């Protein structure tokens, strides 16, 4: 209901996260949730907020996100992160892995799938994507979907650490940051100069409109009610 109201009110974007081991945040697939809103929203851009890349095979992510972009007629923002919930990592068997390394390999593999033509042969440390043994391209077998937006939906990356080097690297790759909602304001503001640094490195403008900041907001009829819930 909140997403539908935001669409009616003219909000520009809305994001939804995912966790598989959190009763308080019980949306287990942000892509599935966004897909459920495709036909009911008209103008708002919808974002995965975020796909936790170490928890899914890159081929599955690439295929789902490509289809979702078509379902939304190009209104998708592709939000990604390494995932911050330890119990999610444990349930997927990645708790002791270098999840930042998995994150980078995951998004690089997704982008290679979208950039490549079948048959695929993409091999990394954690995943391998290939259709070389079974590809029959003349009948469409072994060909993966590509997103509607070219070269791909806008990529948005979570920023958690103060003075995040990841923000700089993301900006240099053409991606946009979204500062996490649990950061204190003095740490959130450190992300902007790091974003500017990354943009300047590749000669792209650093537009404040592309810097997203997540905050927890509680709306009530009066302040007393809000404080009671808090």
What is the role of each PLM region?
Residues 165-171, 206-212, 219-230:
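Aromatic-lined glycan-binding groove of carbohydrate-active enzymes
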Residues 6, 10, 18, 37, ...:
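Conserved, mostly hydrophobic/aromatic
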Residues 50-55:
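The substrate-binding groove and active-site-proximal loops of carbohydrate-active enzymes
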Residues 14-16, 46-49, 76-80, 155-158, ...:
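Hydrophobic faces of well-ordered beta-strands that scaffold small-molecule active sites
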Residues 1-48, 151-153:
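N-terminal beta1-alpha1-beta2 module of alpha/beta enzyme domains
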Residues 26-32, 184-195:
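Active-site-adjacent beta->alpha loops and helix N-cap segments on the catalytic face
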């Amino acid at each position: 209901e909140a997403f539908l109201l935001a669409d009616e009110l003219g909000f520009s974007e809305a994001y939804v996260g995912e966790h598989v081991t959190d009763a308080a945040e019980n949306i287990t697939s942000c892509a599935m949730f966004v897909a459920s809103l495709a036909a009911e929203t008209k103008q708002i851009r919808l974002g995965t907020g975020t796909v936790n890349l170490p928890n899914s095979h890159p081929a599955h992510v690439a295929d789902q996100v490509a289809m979702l972009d078509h379902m939304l007629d190009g209104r998708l923002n592709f939000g990604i992160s390494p995932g911050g919930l330890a119990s999610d990592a444990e349930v997927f068997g990645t708790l002791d892995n270098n999840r930042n390394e998995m994150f980078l390999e995951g998004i690089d593999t997704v982008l290679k799938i979208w950039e490549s033509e079948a048959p695929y042969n993409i091999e990394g440390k954690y995943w391998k994507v290939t259709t070389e043994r079974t590809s029959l391209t003349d009948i469409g077998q072994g060909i993966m979907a590509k997103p509607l937006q070219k070269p791909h939906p806008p990529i948005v990356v979570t920023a958690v650490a103060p003075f995040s080097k990841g923000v700089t690297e993301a900006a240099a790759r053409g991606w946009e940051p979204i500062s996490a909602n649990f950061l204190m304001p003095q740490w959130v503001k450190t992300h902007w100069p790091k974003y500017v640094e990354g943009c300047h490195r590749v000669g792209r403008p650093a537009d404040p409109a592309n810097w997203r900041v997540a905050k927890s907001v509680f709306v009530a009829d009066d302040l007393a009610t809000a404080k009671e819930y808090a």
